[in-house]
Amino acid sequence: MTQINHKNKVMDKLKSIFLCGIFLLYSLQTSLASVVSTGNFNNDFFVTWSPSHVNTSADGRSRSLKLDQEAGSAFASNDMFLFGQIDMPIKLVPGHSAGTVLAFYLTSDQPNRDEIDFELLGNVSGQPYILQTNVYADGFDNREERIYLWFDPTKDFHTYSILWNLHQIVFMVDFVPIRTYRNHADKGVAYPRWQPMGIRISLWDGSSWATRGGKDKVDWSKGPFIVSFANYTIDACVWKGNARFCRADSSSNWWNKEEFTSLSWKQRRWFKWVRKYHLIYDYCQDNKRFNNNLPKECYLSKY
């Protein structure tokens, strides 16, 4: 009997050690899957278009893109992510920037791609900048919204942020929510929730559509056109091939916590202010475009 009891105690101890090991391994994998980067462009990004038009400071903390008659320019993240928040301070092209487009977005680069877009559309001198946002889910887009910015984005850096989790996507400017796109997959609305996405940033000639529907083209005599970036933060789950780590409600995956499932009351007040005073186009109000058959999400809660 004594030998049996001793054997049981040993087995219980081994079982406890095994379970602790599994827990520690899971915690370690979850922790390793999440990354906080406070901004070295050389470490986190690679140039995808026109290296001669991309200028990075010696310490890697700031970067600029150039557009001229020769080419635009672009860079992309080394990693792919599934949920998190990206904050990118940007200083836009000053003066006459009509026809230029600065795109900051997440994309899965798949045929049925998911994508979350910021597009900053250049202006004629004296006119306000327009910020366009869009969401692709399972290859479908046509979800554009446009606002006028309430400040001059060429005078200083302003932070453009994307919060993305299982519950919602929140577009923010200087941490003011300007748009949400909620997960209504249970109601038949496509939502980006399975495909990891990388960060892409590009500056290019959008003369055919960007400013007043293409009426105002890029004036190359005003160039070159320069956009600057600095002090970004990536706080997101790096894709390692297993979605459950990125979906876990862990201390490192703070964006999955209950408080981020919808806008706070304070955020809702700011959101309503933006929609009331600065919104200039919302696809959910464009009955003509959709032949009076608006997408399902247009009838569902935004927060």
Where are these regions (language model features)?
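GH16 jelly-roll
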Residues: T2-Q3, D12-Y303
